[in-house]
Amino acid sequence: MSETTSLEDLKGAMEGTSASADANAVPAVQKLDKFGRAYATGKRKNAVARVWIKPGSGRVKINGRDLEVYFARPVLRMILNQPLVVAAREKQYDITATVVGGGLSGQAGAIRHGISRALTYFEPSLRGVLKKEGFLTRDSRVVERKKYGKAKARRSFQFSKR
């Protein structure tokens, strides 16, 4: 190791190490199973989704049923497809998902979260785009609990002055 005698030597040494660290950075690697699929889990409200993606024609199966059958409302299908649209990867991956818990809206959000994470495992270069759009962040909002002495979580019982 070389001797550092002045502040300039120290700055030069630090700049040299940071530049070499960037050059020697290990590129992100795909995380695939033995079938060539990327697996990820997604959560939203009380719903938990397990998602597998593999290269294909854009087929989506949820709990063994087609996307149009499981999510009849177009809004829920749109929520589910958002990560693919943002990443410009529509019709390029076959998606298989199993989802339990919650309602349809929470399930659609959980699958969206799972698809986003699986896409980053398949194509690590998409991480920046998906993170910027907020698809990789777990939406932590859940239903507020009911409190005793109240009708609901915040709603009080009707008050009578007399």
From Swiss-Prot:
Gene Ontology cellular component list: cytosolic small ribosomal subunit
**GO biological processes:** translation
Entry annotated with the keyword Hydrolase: no
SUPFAM superfamilies registered for this protein in UniProt: Ribosomal protein S5 domain 2-like
Enumerate the GO terms in the molecular function aspect.
RNA binding; structural constituent of ribosome
Domain of life here?
Answer: Bacteria
Query: Cross-referenced InterPro entries, in alphabetical order?
Result: Ribosomal_Su5_D2-typ_SF, Ribosomal_uS9, Ribosomal_uS9_bac/plastid, Ribosomal_uS9_CS, Ribsml_uS5_D2-typ_fold_subgr
Give the transmembrane ranges: none
Could you confirm whether the keyword Metal-binding appears in this record? no
Among PROSITE patterns, the record links this protein to: RIBOSOMAL_S9
Keyword annotations of the record: Ribonucleoprotein, Ribosomal protein
Q: What's this protein's family per the entry?
A: Belongs to the universal ribosomal protein uS9 family.
NCBIfam families cross-referenced by the UniProt entry? PRK00132.1 (NF001099)
Q: What is this protein called?
A: Small ribosomal subunit protein uS9
The organism is Parvibaculum lavamentivorans (strain DS-1 / DSM 13023 / NCIMB 13966)
- What gene does the UniProt entry assign to this protein? rpsI
